[in-house]
From Swiss-Prot:
It is found in: Cytoplasm. The keyword Transit peptide does not apply. The gene is recX. Keywords: Cytoplasm. It comes from the Bacteria. Modulates RecA activity. Belongs to the RecX family. This is Regulatory protein RecX.
Amino acid sequence: MPFITKISTQKKNTERFNIFLDEKYAFSVDADVLVRFDLKKGKELDELDILEIQYGDDVKKAFNRAVEFLSYRMRSEKEVRDHLKKKETPDMVISEVIHKLYDYRYLNDKEFAEAYASTHKKTNGKGPDVLFRELKAKGIDDDTIKETLSAFTFDEQIQEALKHIGKILKKDKKLSTKEIRQRAQMQLQRKGFPFDVINAALEQTEYENDDEAEMEALKAHAEKAIRKYRYDGSYESGMKVKQYLFRKGFSIDDIDQFLQEEE
């Protein structure tokens, strides 16, 4: 069986050591592995010893890689597993690393889910449906997700939905009443709010235009339609403009009134 004849520190990484067996380089190990296996000059190693040492070093390297990955932000177990797989880490090593991360409390899917939901609810205004899908994609189990999102009360969801509607009303002033409602519904659905929350939020919102605002919105759209369809007072071009404005949510009476004033 070979003996350790030399141990030297690596130049680029002083936490790693080169092991020489019978005067020939054999492998390198982390400082922790060196201590754990009591590697020193003159120690005899058989084949099984070497395999065990190398496996221990693989675990240590993967663990360090995982800790670095976790240093940027909280991660779910699945995110860490996927990261290590991309680095071609063997499944057995990954499983041991995950176990160690839980032991050190570096991983906790419940705490991760709570932090993720809280952050994205506040910063991105996401609703529970989107949060559920995103947490599911990150490997969080259904029970944990449901428990996490149960803290997002119905009233809180309505308040978040109202913020989105407020932004739409502030930004898009030249919209018909129908368009405002449709745009708000679509935006809230994309953000992951359920229909009962959307309807409740819309009921609490004064989004209907007064007559003057509605006519201003109609005028803005009509000017686009007149240019687009080259309105010249003819029946054909008039119908195209009317259809366009009707699809935008304006009433026939308001459309006719506007076109009559244009003639």
